[in-house]
A protein has these predicted regions:
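Conserved beta-ketoacyl condensing-enzyme motif
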Residues: 6, 27-169, 198-207, 301-317
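ACP-dependent fatty acid/polyketide chain-elongation machinery
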Residues: 1-74, 251-261, 358-372, 416-419
C-alpha cells in the first residue's frame, strides 16, 4: 500500500488566519470566542461565537480579506465558506512548495467538505423571495450555497484536475475529508490531494437552529463558554474557518524534495445507527472507529502519545466520547493526554476535524500538547488524563484525532512522526 505524508498546511481560524498564527494562538492559550457581531442577537439566547474577524480597516492584516487570496471577481462569486477553503488551500500549496507547472494536474485532486454550505446566501435570498418575489433571487444562489462548491472553487483557483470530492458528514466532515484524501492516494487514484474542511454558519438561522436544539452554550463569559470535559459545560460555541492540508504519496514527495511534516498511517470510520444528534451512549460506535484506525496503523493503545478529542463541550458528547476512548484503549486510556482544540476556537463544524488535524501535526512537529483551556473540574465518570491548566512539552510520535457528527458519523485518523 502506498504511504501518504503531509507536505503542506493552511488554516483560517478564529485565532489566526494562517497556520503559524493559529498555532501561536494555541500555544498561548488564546480563546477566539467573543460576542457575535454578524447580526443582532437581541432575541437570541446565544450571544457568543468564535468568528473569523471581518475586515474593518485595510491595515488590519490579521483580519480576513478574500482579495488577499483571489481576485475580486472570483471572491464575489463565492460565499464565505468557499473563500475560507480557497484561502487555506492557497496557504497549503505555498507551504508545500508544489509547482503545478511541473505536475500532471489530473493526478492532483481535492477532498474538501463543508457540513452546511452557505446559510447566509439562503437567508438573504429567502428574504428577497418573500419581499420582492422569485425574480429577484440571485441567479447564482445555488452554486453559491451548495456544499461542494468549496471543493469546486479550490480546484478552479488552483488548477487541480484530479479526483474532486465533497464529503458531508456534519461535524466529522473535516476528518472524513482528510481520510478519504488519504485513501485516494493509498489506492493510486491520485498522487496529491488537497484535503480538509470549511464552514461559515454564524448567521441568524444557523445560531437559531442550533440554539433550538439546545446544543449551544448560553454562557455570557467567553472564557467559560466552550469548556470540554468540564462539569459545568452546557453546550458548544459555534465557530467558523477552514483547514486544508496537502497529502502526498511518499515517493512523489521525496522525488521533488518536499518537506514532510508527518505521515498518516490509519483511518477508521463507523456509524452509531442510533440517534440523529446524540452519539451512542456506550461509546461503541466511536470506539470502533478508533480501533479500526489503530489496527490499520499497526499501533497499540500504549503507543498513542496524544488524543485530540472531538470534545464539543456538550454533556452527551464529552461523556460518551470518554466512554469510547476507554473502550478503545482499555487501561492505556487513563494515561494518554486528551485535549480538545474547541476550547480555544469553538466548534468549526465541517472544518473542525481539519483544523484539529493541523493542531495534531503541529503537536508532533513542536513536541507540544495543548491544554483544555478553561477546564476547571470534571465529574466522576470523566476520569481520563485531560490536559488541564498548562500545555505539555514532550516528544510526540503518534497522535489520534477523533470527530463525531450528527447522524452517528464517527471518524478517526492516526498521524505520526515521519521516519
Amino acid at each position: 500500500m502506498r504511504r501518504v505524508v503531509v507536505t503542506g498546511m493552511g488554516a483560517i481560524t478564529p485565532i489566526g488566519n494562517s497556520v503559524d498564527e493559529f498555532w501561536q494562538g494555541i500555544k498561548a492559550g488564546k480563546v477566539g470566542i467573543d460576542e457575535i457581531t454578524k447580526f443582532d442577537t437581541t432575541d437570541y439566547s446565544v450571544k457568543l461565537a468564535a468568528e473569523v474577524k471581518e475586515v474593518k480597516l485595510a491595515a488590519e492584516v490579521k483580519d480576513f480579506d478574500a482579495k488577499n487570496y483571489m481576485d475580486f471577481k472570483a471572491a464575489k462569486r463565492m460565499e464565505k465558506f468557499s473563500q475560507y477553503a480557497v484561502a487555506a488551500a492557497h496557504e497549503a500549496m505555498k507551504d508545500s512548495g508544489l509547482d503545478m507547472a511541473k505536475e500532471d494536474a489530473f493526478r492532483v485532486g481535492v477532498s474538501v467538505g463543508s457540513g452546511v454550505g452557505s446559510l447566509e446566501a439562503m437567508e438573504s435570498n429567502h428574504k428577497k423571495l418573500l419581499e420582492k418575489g422569485p425574480s429577484r433571487i440571485n441567479p447564482l444562489l445555488v452554486p453559491l450555497m451548495i456544499t461542494n462548491m468549496a471543493a469546486g472553487n479550490v480546484s478552479i483557483q488552483l488548477g487541480l484536475k484530479g479526483k474532486n470530492i465533497n464529503v458531508v458528514t456534519a461535524c466529522a466532515t473535516g476528518t472524513n475529508s482528510i481520510g478519504e484524501g488519504y485513501r485516494s492516494i493509498q489506492h493510486g487514484e491520485a498522487d496529491v490531494m488537497f484535503a480538509g474542511g470549511t464552514e461559515s454558519s454564524i448567521s441568524p438561522i444557523g445560531i437559531g437552529g442550533f440554539a433550538a436544539l439546545t446544543a449551544l452554550s448560553t454562557s455570557t463569559d467567553p472564557k467559560r463558554a466552550s469548556i470540554p470535559f468540564d462539569k459545568e459545560r452546557n453546550g458548544f460555541v459555534m465557530g467558523e474557518g477552514a483547514g486544508v492540508v496537502v497529502l502526498e504519496e511518499l515517493e512523489h514527495a521525496l522525488k521533488r524534495g518536499a518537506h514532510i511534516y508527518a505521515e498518516i498511517t490509519g483511518y477508521g470510520c463507523s456509524s452509531d445507527a442510533y440517534h440523529i444528534t446524540s452519539p451512542m451512549e456506550d461509546g461503541s460506535g466511536a470506539a470502533y472507529a478508533m480501533t479500526s484506525a489503530m489496527k490499520e496503523a499497526e499501533v497499540k493503545p500504549d503507543d498513542i502519545d496524544y488524543i485530540n478529542a472531538h470534545g464539543t463541550s456538550t454533556h452527551h458528547n464529552d461523556l460518551f466520547e470518554t466512554r469510547a476512548i476507554k473502550l478503545a484503549l482499555k487501561d492505556a486510556a487513563y494515561n494518554v493526554p486528551v485535549s480538545s482544540t474547541k476550547s480555544m476556537v469553538g466548534h468549526l463544524l465541517g472544518a473542525a476535524g481539519a483544523v484539529e488535524f493541523i493542531a495534531c501535526v503541529k503537536s508532533i512537529q513542536d513536541g507540544y500538547i495543548h491544554p483544555n483551556v478553561g477546564l476547571s473540574e470534571t465529574e466522576e465518570e470523566m476520569d481520563l488524563n485531560y490536559v488541564k491548566d498548562e500545555g505539555i512539552e514532550k516528544n510526540v510520535d503518534v497522535v489520534m484525532t477523533n470527530s463525531l457528527g450528527f447522524g452517528g458519523h464517527n471518524a478517526t485518523l492516526i498521524v505520526r512522526k515521519y521516519s
